[in-house]
Amino acid sequence: MLIPYDQLEPDTLTRLIEDFVTREGTDNGDETPLQTRVLRVRHALTKGQAVIFFDLESQQCQLMLKHDVPKEFFD
C-alpha cells in the first residue's frame, strides 16, 4: 500500500526519512550532512521519484524509488 507523504504528520515524516538515510548501507561512505540527505529524500518525495510503501505482511513502512514499486500498487 502506498502512503501519500503529505498525509503524514511532519514529525513522523522527518523521523521516517532520518531512519532511512541513517540506515547501515545507505550512506556508502557518503559524508554528506544528515540534513542534506533528508532534504534530498524530501525532494524525491515531492517530485514523485520516491514513495512511502507500507508492507502489509511485515507491517513496516519503507521509502522506495517509484520505479522499484510493483505497478499494481499504482492502480
Swiss-Prot record:
Domain of life: Bacteria
InterPro entries: UPF0270 (IPR010648), YehU-like_sf (IPR036685)
SUPFAM superfamilies to which the protein is assigned, alphabetical: YehU-like (SSF118001)
Pfam families: UPF0270 (PF06794)
Family: Belongs to the UPF0270 family.
HAMAP family documented for this protein: UPF0270
The protein, known as: UPF0270 protein PSPTO_1630
Record organism: Pseudomonas syringae pv. tomato (strain ATCC BAA-871 / DC3000)
